[in-house]
Design a protein with these regions (language model features):
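Hydrophobic/aromatic-enriched cytosolic interaction surfaces used to assemble or bind macromolecules
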Residues: 1-292
Length: 292
């Protein structure tokens, strides 16, 4: 399900890190239940798809260096999980999809060029062709992020002795905490960024990431309601479950209202490795993917 750039059969990286505006969640993949968090000063990271996210590079470099093991000069392989809003993730459907990689990229670029707010020529583009039954449309998951943004996130880790060979986004990694049953909606709130992912079984059907003016129940519903309506139109069925992550008290208090407004069961997303939050959901999901 994820767009991690992993070669089949490769062992997992030794470390995994998730970056947010609040800090760095991290852990060793050999001990997935032992996840920690190191806060960052306010303003060190400011997430955007349009500009450099690392506003205080010296501060980020110092905090990452503090996480490095004593033998950091050995270059430990690491997975790096980026904030959702610095990238763009979409699900494109095709009646037919070419087998040639270059033709695939050209077709994807043609379809998505006018929908992203940055230059495709300077972006890193990954795509995953999801399995489809004969006669069904082919759903392709596409993730794009400006190359310079990725480089700026990776640099302090490389300097500290880590080798971030795998890069994904928080919501994409968090999908590994969702059991592939029926139609499920995952909603993840991180600050004012709301990510919505909809799965039918293990197939991703919708990916949205919206910056809210404020994290109120009304603003959240203004994103969730159209998402449910879209799924009803496209899949001819309502989501059976809404999984919440990062909503804190708002989610606890508003869950009954959302259940009534959306007509779906509402519950928190869960992981065997801890309580998923706005700062570690991607990390815990990544750990779940290694255990699968």
């Amino acid at each position: 399900m994820s767009l991690l750039n992993t070669l089949l059969g490769d062992p997992p990286p030794a470390w995994a890190f998730e970056i947010s505006e609040s800090g760095i969640a991290f852990g060793r993949t050999a001990t997935p239940g032992d996840v920690s968090f190191r806060p960052l000063p306010e303003g060190a990271i400011s997430v955007s798809p349009l500009r450099d996210n690392v506003q205080l590079p010296d501060v980020l470099a110092r905090e990452v260096a503090a996480l490095a093991p004593p033998d950091a000069h050995h270059h430990h392989r690491a997975a790096l999980i980026l904030p959702d809003y610095c990238a763009r993730t979409a699900v494109l459907d095709f009646d037919a999809f070419p087998a040639n990689h270059d033709e695939q990229r050209a077709l994807i670029s043609f379809r998505i060029r006018k929908t992203v707010p940055f230059d495709l020529e300077s972006a890193i583009v990954s795509h995953y062709v999801q399995p489809a039954a004969t006669g069904e449309k082919i759903d392709v998951v596409v993730a794009l992020v400006p190359q310079e943004i990725v480089i700026r996130y990776e640099t302090p880790f490389r300097t500290a002795g880590f080798q971030p060979g795998e890069v994904t986004t928080s919501a994409m990694a968090a999908l590994h905490m969702v059991k592939p049953e029926g139609i499920t909606m995952l909603a993840k709130l991180a600050g004012l960024t709301l990510s919505v992912m909809v799965l039918r079984g293990s197939t991703l059907k919708l990916a949205r990431c919206v910056e809210l003016p404020e994290a109120t129940s009304a603003e959240i519903l203004s994103v969730l309601c159209p998402s449910v309506a879209y799924i009803e139109d496209e899949l001819l069925a309502r989501p059976e479950k809404l999984l919440l992550c990062g909503f804190g008290r708002v989610g606890d208090e508003e869950a009954p209202l959302w259940r009534g407004e959306l007509g779906v069961e509402v519950e928190p997303v869960r992981s065997r490795y801890g309580m998923p939050s706005s700062t570690n959901a991607g990390l815990l999901g990544y750990m779940e993917s290694l255990a699968a």
